[in-house]
Amino acid sequence: MRTLWIVAVLLVGVEGNLLQFNKMIKIMTRKNGIPYYSSYGCYCGWGGQGQPLDATDRCCFVHDCCYEKLTDCSPKTDIYSYSWKSGVIICGEGTPCEKQICECDRVAAVCFGANLGTYKKSYMFYPDFLCTEPSEKC
């Protein structure tokens, strides 16, 4: 299932929001989001279930919840504007959807950066079937 997310990222093209999110992740972590965050733990990548495994996985859980709260928006494909200076990401002008999507992505990227010290390579490409705990509500 998470492999589909990676394929979706590659098919969206350079204008897609997922690639903008990947760029934000690179700014905050100096890591490429696709291998490091596209299939990490129980929540990073497509979908999510169970309990977040660590602080990085919780960043993804919160990001998923942020996207869920957006109505009449397409968070994985809408294009937004943002800038960065000295490691600070600033969401730019745009529609209410674009601004909210950008803010969801910005908060997640900052969260990833803040939790680099606890990132566990053993949670990369974590199999969904191991995420069996009851899921939290947003």
Curated annotation (Swiss-Prot):
Cysteine disulfide partners in this protein: C42-C131, C44-C60, C59-C111, C65-C138, C66-C104, C73-C97, C91-C102
Gene3D superfamilies noted in UniProt: Phospholipase A2 domain
Cleavable signal peptide: 1-16
InterPro entries per UniProt: PLipase_A2 (IPR001211), PLipase_A2_Asp_AS (IPR033112), PLipase_A2_dom (IPR016090), PLipase_A2_dom_sf (IPR036444), PLipase_A2_His_AS (IPR033113)
A Pfam family hit: Phospholip_A2_1
Location of the protein in the cell: Secreted
An annotated Gene Ontology molecular function: calcium-dependent phospholipase A2 activity
Cofactor: binding comment: Binds 1 Ca(2+) ion.
Name the record gives this protein: Basic phospholipase A2 Bs-N6
Origin: domain of life: Eukaryota
Family, per entry: Belongs to the phospholipase A2 family. Group II subfamily. D49 sub-subfamily.
Biological role stated in the UniProt entry: Snake venom phospholipase A2 (PLA2) that shows myotoxic activities. PLA2 catalyzes the calcium-dependent hydrolysis of the 2-acyl groups in 3-sn-phosphoglycerides.
Organism of this sequence: Bothriechis schlegelii
Sequence positions that bind Ca(2+): Y43, G45, G47, D64
Cofactor dependence: Ca(2+)
Complex and partners: Monomer.
Residues forming the catalytic site: H63, D105
